Amino acid sequence: MTLLNPFFGEFGGMYVPQILIPALLQLEKAFVDAKDDPAFIAEFQTLLTEYAGRPTPLTLTRNLTKGTKTRLYLKREDLLHGGAHKTNQVLGQALLAKRMGKSEIIAETGAGQHGVATALACALLGLKCRVYMGAKDCERQKPNVFRMKLMGATVIPVHSGSSTLKDACNEALRDWAANYESAHYLLGTAAGPHPFPTIVREFQKMIGEEAKAQCFEKEERLPDAVIACVGGGSNAIGMFADFIDEPSVRLIGVEPGGHGIESGEHGAPLGHGSKGVFFGMHSYLMQDTQGQIQESYSVSAGLDFPSVGPQHAHLAAIGRAEYPSVTDKEALDAFQELAKSEGIIPALESSHALAHALKMARSEPEKEQVLIVNLSGRGDKDIFTVADIFEKEGTLS
């Protein structure tokens, strides 16, 4: 029997082998106890402020929306220690692991950002760390592989399946099933079996809480929309959580359109998938008519995931949030534009959200609106990927 509701409407649940149920229930109990323990909360807050660098700024863009009446703000998770929003919830889960008496951490990573965040938290808190990463992603994200190793983590390349994030997730779950007594599985996104979607949201929701307060301070009102990229969905749910009960604020989660939805090479299960069970949860996923998981695709390794967190599935189903998609090309254009106009190099993941915000601003230039984009990470990890693409296309002017 769970202590918290494992479902968001019809989505969520705990669809895992029986052997993992005790580990998930132990984790849920530890989380429920910890969130009501002032000492745990104080330690988490201290790490967020003194180690990670919170609160992060809300930056008004100066040049990007010239010619429009949009005021576009960036929530600067790229300035967080570790380079992305991932550090927030990793510190929370690592503290939980120590509280449960675990000595080892297992993690999966796509772009490598969650792996880096996990490695730094383990180094700080004295935990052993092993990270599963798709072999294809290891190639795409060599700087992050080196960072993880530098901080003492063991990086295990996964060659099965499509050699990407979904395969790394499967291997990490297998490892946890065999070693859950000594190890905690530090899941990197707001997906997977209960209680992970709830835990990750709670350890990421300061993004939206800060953004709301900062927006009131600067604009004396709520934003018209908050916009975030969606792979598994942790940075988006962290931004959305504090705005869900504010009906005047549009919640926009941007999925990766890859080479275009019509090409079939994308990662947009909310817009173009169907319901099913995957990775321990009931959600939307990319599957064929036989229920086989289809390969997702995105230029951004961190969005290359064939499903999505159950709370996003629920928000989509009830019409509270909208989930458009942005192609590789649109994201790459936004990546270059932010760098040239504001001197900020965003992660390719975050560039998807930025691209959609720019569409909103430019499609209605006379509309006075306040938009907040969650700039979920910085683009250092992506410069080699992008340089190769621009070189092939001859597009770096």
From Swiss-Prot:
Pfam families, sorted: PALP (PF00291)
Xref: InterPro entries: Trp_synth_b_CS, Trp_synth_beta, Trp_synth_beta/beta-like, TrpB-like_PALP, TrpB-like_PALP_sf
Gene Ontology cellular-component terms listed: cytoplasm
UniProt entry tagged with the keyword Lyase: yes
Cofactor field: pyridoxal 5'-phosphate
EC number(s) on file: 4.2.1.20
Database matches in PROSITE patterns: TRP_SYNTHASE_BETA
Catalytic activity, reaction form: (1S,2R)-1-C-(indol-3-yl)glycerol 3-phosphate + L-serine = D-glyceraldehyde 3-phosphate + L-tryptophan + H2O
Pathway named in the protein's UniProt entry: Amino-acid biosynthesis; L-tryptophan biosynthesis; L-tryptophan from chorismate: step 5/5
Sites of N6-(pyridoxal phosphate)lysine modification: 86
Gene Ontology molecular function, alphabetical: tryptophan synthase activity
Top EC class for this record: lyase
Keywords recorded for this protein, A-Z: Amino-acid biosynthesis, Aromatic amino acid biosynthesis, Lyase, Pyridoxal phosphate, Tryptophan biosynthesis
Highest taxon of the lineage: Bacteria
The protein's role, per its UniProt record: The beta subunit is responsible for the synthesis of L-tryptophan from indole and L-serine.
Family from the record: Belongs to the TrpB family.
PANTHER family: TRYPTOPHAN SYNTHASE (PTHR48077:SF3), TRYPTOPHAN SYNTHASE-RELATED (PTHR48077)
Subunit structure: Tetramer of two alpha and two beta chains.
Record's protein name: Tryptophan synthase beta chain
Annotated organism of origin: Aeromonas hydrophila subsp. hydrophila (strain ATCC 7966 / DSM 30187 / BCRC 13018 / CCUG 14551 / JCM 1027 / KCTC 2358 / NCIMB 9240 / NCTC 8049)
Lineage of origin: Bacteria, Pseudomonadati, Pseudomonadota, Gammaproteobacteria, Aeromonadales
